[in-house]
Amino acid sequence: MKMKQVHKTLWRWASIAWFACLSARAQDVQFLPEADANLKLNSTVRVYLQAKDDRDGGDPTQLTIGPSIQFYLKPLLKLKDITTFDLDDSKSRALVLETGYRSVTAPGAPPENRMETIATFHFPLKARFLISDRNRADLDWKNGGFNWRYRNKLTVERSLSIHSYHFIPYIAAEPYYESQYKKWSTTALYAGCLFPVGKHVQFNIYYEHENNTGKRPNQQQNYIGLALYLYFSLAKK
């Protein structure tokens, strides 16, 4: 299969997923769009800008936008080998530290300011599987009040191929502890796939199920997500 044909096929899949997600909005399944633009400054530092429809932890429809900066360790040979076809080269690092700011806005609600601090560990396994352990703390200021939450996302993924094209299916689980409820109030489960297109574009198409117990009655939420990741670099190869 020629690479040009693969690219056309992927764009077609992305279009189908987009329209499927739009039709799902009228049903119980909701659509979560996202776009991230990443710029690698050197071998150990990357910045990115993120814009997404954020309904994490049972939040209402809201727009989250803001920048982040990431700091890497040097890549490990084993990790670099099993993530060769993933455009996100942070996965080849055993530890990635990150901090960022997000402006959170929602219709009819006061704006929210969020600071994010994240530490992600990557572990290579046998049979070319990769485990990612992301530990994230959100510090939220809204209308004079303050809340925080801790999120621990564990992801298992493995690159597969059809002819010469490689894609990356994954599953993940993420529990949340939220200070406003003083308990582990949310559990999110994910199943998705990463589709690289060329050297700079990667799509993430996924299904997410959330169980929220912070408010009564408990809420079950289902989402289909479509994320566009752009990767650029100023670092010399």
What are these regions (language model features)?
Residues 1-31:
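Bacterial Sec-dependent N-terminal signal peptides
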Residues 26-42, 235-237:
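Outer-membrane beta-barrel initiation region
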Residues 27-28, 54-61, 106-110, 182-183:
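Acidic-and-aromatic substrate-binding clefts and catalytic sites of carbohydrate-active enzymes
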Residues 29-31, 61-65, 111-115, 146-152, ...:
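Residues that define the transmembrane beta-barrel architecture of outer-membrane proteins
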Residues 33, 44-56, 80-86, 93-107, ...:
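Transmembrane beta-strand segments that form the barrel wall of outer-membrane beta-barrel proteins
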Residues 62-123:
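Hydrophobic/aromatic-rich structural module bridging two neighboring secondary-structure elements via a short loop
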Residues 73-77, 123-215, 224, 229-237:
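Outer-membrane beta-barrel transmembrane domain signature
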